[in-house]
Amino acid sequence: MEPEEADLDDLVEEEDIFTRLVFYNHKGDTLAGSFTADPSEVAIILGAWDVRDDTVAAGLYLEGEHYEVHRWYYNLVYGRKGIAGDGEGIGVCRVKGKDGSYNYGLVTYTYPILSARAISRLLHLCKKYLTVL
């Protein structure tokens, strides 16, 4: 049975390792989420793959907070703000949906959750739930 859009709302409610979790379509429309981000920030975040050097240099902004980007891959961008043990991580994943356009997952997380756990979980969720939309 393929996951459906309604399943995303349940998923967001059940996930407990993230401080924020939201899914977007290629237009930046929210599919499901635990918060509402500023549309101008969402547009920049979803454009993180446009120019790698620009994204790494500028970082990402979410709810007015600046996050340094320290990893940039074809399907993942992630980083953090603050210092180890007292900061917050951010991760964005993109996967192609059924129609070939990208869908996105965005998370933030805090210690004791580390990027190794949070980002691998984000990637798993995006592959399972967003590729079928």
Give the ranges of each region predicted by the language model.
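Non-catalytic interaction/Regulatory regions outside core domains
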Residues: 1-133
